[in-house]
């Protein structure tokens, strides 16, 4: 995940989250470094202590639940606004898809068109641990769809289920631990996708292919609703309790729908100035 040319310093496991602000203060000069943090453990108390040390702080958020002490709050959910937050008066906001958190490869792909005409190759990715093994259920459903000739499955690093390997066939390819370039190539080799409303959805929209999407945890629902409002996805709703038949029914509806409108909507979600916008934002607090 971390590019090889980046400098890296690892926090010892002995340093608890309560001790972390002190450790950071000892390791880094507040005049040379700013902090960008992403995780539920970086709560209001943590942010307050970091700010008391004198650091500039950027917090990547997806819940808008706690009081924020950060200098900048990033939340790329489509429908989010500053009114959703409780924060310090001088806090700046980077909200919505104008500040989509996209990796460099996908920022470049925004500039390209996808000319694929066929709709026979599925891309499946539920990321992380996939606790409900939606990957397996979707794959079984896809095997029952005559239009589907090939299935590309990308598993998250924490995926531990085994049955998916037992149904592997010559038209099913399973991938794991991919670089962003490898992931983008598999996406571009696919002609439609099934994925949750998480970061993977943003990256798929950069590829510009039809996407069946849903949510299965709370922090995905706002993103899902935003993309649904933009008519950028085929909507499956809450998929937490879906079984194979549920996914198969959605796939039949999908293949009878108009893909063009979805892809036209995807083209409008992101612009080509995201990187420039972030550079300007970060410089504003330096």
Listing of model-derived features with the role each one plays in the protein:
Residues 2-88, 93:
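Active-site and donor-binding regions of nucleotide-sugar-utilizing enzymes
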Residues 70-132, 161:
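A nucleotide-sugar donor-handling region in carbohydrate enzymes
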């Amino acid at each position: 995940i971390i590019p090889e040319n980046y400098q890296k310093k690892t926090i010892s496991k002995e340093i608890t989250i309560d001790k972390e602000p002190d450790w950071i203060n000892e390791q880094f000069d507040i005049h040379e470094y700013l902090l960008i943090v992403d995780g539920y453990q970086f709560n209001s108390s943590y942010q307050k202590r970091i700010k008391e040390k004198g650091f500039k702080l950027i917090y990547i958020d997806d819940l808008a639940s706690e009081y924020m002490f950060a200098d900048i709050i990033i939340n790329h959910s489509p429908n989010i606004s500053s009114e959703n937050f409780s924060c310090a008066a001088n806090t700046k906001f980077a909200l919505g898809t104008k500040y989509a958190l996209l990796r460099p490869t996908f920022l470049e792909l925004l500039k390209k068109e996808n000319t694929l005409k066929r709709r026979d190759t599925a891309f499946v990715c539920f990321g992380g641990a996939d606790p409900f093994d939606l990957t397996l259920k979707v794959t079984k459903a896809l095997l029952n769809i005559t239009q589907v000739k090939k299935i590309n499955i990308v598993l998250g690093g924490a995926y531990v289920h085994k049955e998916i390997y037992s149904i592997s066939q010559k038209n099913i390819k399973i991938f794991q631990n991919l670089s962003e370039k490898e992931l983008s190539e598999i996406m571009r080799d696919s002609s439609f996708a099934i994925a949750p409303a998480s970061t993977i959805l943003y990256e798929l929209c950069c590829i510009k292919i039809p996407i069946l999407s849903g949510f299965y945890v709370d922090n995905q629902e706002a993103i899902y609703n935003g993309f649904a409002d933009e008519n950028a996805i085929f909507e499956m709703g809450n998929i937490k309790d879906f079984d194979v038949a549920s996914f198969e029914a959605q796939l039949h509806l999908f293949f009878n729908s108009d893909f063009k409108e979805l892809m036209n909507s995807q083209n409008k979600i992101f612009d080509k100035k995201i990187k420039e916008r972030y550079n300007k934002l970060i410089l504003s607090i330096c």
